[in-house]
């Protein structure tokens, strides 16, 4: 059985997005833009900026020491 909030909350969000947001958003957006001003994203022309040397680190960024073993099966 599904709980009441699991049904009611998505329906209320859909009603808000479909019917209320088009009227409320134009009223609220000037205040929000004053609180959180957008800053321009500056693009750099440096081609080496995105490249990182991964020597000595595994894929999740943690340093590796010696061989790592990955087992997919349980050992009894």
Swiss-Prot record:
InterPro entries: UPF0729_C18orf32-like
Annotated signal sequence range: none
Name of the protein described by the UniProt record: UPF0729 protein C18orf32
Region described as Necessary for its localzation to the endoplasmic reticulum and lipid droplets: spans on this chain: 1-37
Modification after translation: Undergoes ER-associated degradation (ERAD).
Pathology noted in the entry: Glycosylphosphatidylinositol biosynthesis defect 25: An autosomal recessive disorder with onset in early infancy and characterized by global developmental delay with almost no milestone achievement, brain anomalies, hypotonia, and contractures. Death may occur in early childhood.
Biological source species: Homo sapiens (Human)
UniProt-listed GO biological process terms: positive regulation of canonical NF-kappaB signal transduction
Organism lineage: Eukaryota, Metazoa, Chordata, Craniata, Vertebrata
The entry's keywords: Endoplasmic reticulum, Lipid droplet
Protein task: May activate the NF-kappa-B signaling pathway.
Assigned GO CC terms: endoplasmic reticulum; lipid droplet
Stretches for region Disordered: 46-76
Compartments, as annotated in UniProt: Endoplasmic reticulum; Lipid droplet
Gene transcribed to yield this protein: C18orf32
